[in-house]
């Protein structure tokens, strides 16, 4: 069905008037350029949106490492998989395992900018229990994020604790989405680079769209991983936005 025949649905006179007016406007060079630009822009926008979704879905962001960096990653990954706590939690049927590949989200600090050799070396392994609202995260922090004395800035510890506490709050909120309303952190002792860290959190209470969580961070001894030192104690209050149900499609992590 052509444009003219389609417009006849509104009556003969309106159809003729609208179609003739459209033809006159299309003879204007500026109008033609506008239509062409609009078509090209719309096509590019649609293609970009579709490709972006494909990339996010298929995890095809490429990360290139040097030979030395690959050795570091493989060594840390092997040590991570052999940690006793990882093996124990993996065998515990109450816990589910979650691991988000690096560069899964362009808007994540720890999963993008701070990820890779010398930083957060490999993707942290996360275990969570929906029934008890407990979360464990095991991560390795490399030398490149350290200060002059090889200590880790408390801000990085606070960022990591905030994310682990947030995951814990997701387990108790209807739409599994929340934003940080308040975060309190104390550092009993210094944290150092080139160590594995265990971040733990549990739910204290929920009320409506609010969830209060508590967590701790432990630095494992490199010589004897069974020994650990508490480097952070945190309390976080998280609030689910009123429009949270409309944000599910933009959250890079889902908790099945």
Curated annotation (Swiss-Prot):
Coarse class of the protein's main subcellular location: mitochondrion
InterPro entries according to UniProt: HotDog_dom_sf (IPR029069), PTE-AB_protein (IPR052061)
Keywords: Membrane, Mitochondrion, Transmembrane, Transmembrane helix
Residue intervals passing through the bilayer: 34-56
Keyword Amino-acid biosynthesis annotated: no
Family that this chain belongs to: Belongs to the UPF0644 family.
Protein name: UPF0644 protein PB2B4.06
Organism (species): Schizosaccharomyces pombe (strain 972 / ATCC 24843)
């Amino acid at each position: 069905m052509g444009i003219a025949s389609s417009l006849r649905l509104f009556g003969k006179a309106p159809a003729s008037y609208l179609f003739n007016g459209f033809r006159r406007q299309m003879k204007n060079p500026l109008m033609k350029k506008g239509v062409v630009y609009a078509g090209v822009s719309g096509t590019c926008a649609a293609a970009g949106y579709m490709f972006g979704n494909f990339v996010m879905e298929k995890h095809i962001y490429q990360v290139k490492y040097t030979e030395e960096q690959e050795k570091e990653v493989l060594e840390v990954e092997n040590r991570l998989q052999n940690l006793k706590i990882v093996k124990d939690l993996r065998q515990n049927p109450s816990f589910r395992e979650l691991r988000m590949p690096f560069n899964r989200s362009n808007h994540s600090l720890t999963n993008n900018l701070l990820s890779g050799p010398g930083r957060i070396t490999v993707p942290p392994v996360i275990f969570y229990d929906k029934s008890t609202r407990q979360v464990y995260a095991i991560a390795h922090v490399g030398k490149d994020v350290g200060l002059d004395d090889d200590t880790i800035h408390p801000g990085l510890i606070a960022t990591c604790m905030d994310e682990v506490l947030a995951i814990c709050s997701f387990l108790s909120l209807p739409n599994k989405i929340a934003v940080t309303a308040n975060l309190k952190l104390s550092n009993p002792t210094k944290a150092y680079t080139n160590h594995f860290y265990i971040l733990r959190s549990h739910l204290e209470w929920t009320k409506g769209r609010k969830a209060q969580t508590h967590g701790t961070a432990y630095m494992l001894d490199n010589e004897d991983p069974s020994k650990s030192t508490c480097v952070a104690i945190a309390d976080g209050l998280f609030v689910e936005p009123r429009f949270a149900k409309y944000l599910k499609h933009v959250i890079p992590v889902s908790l099945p």
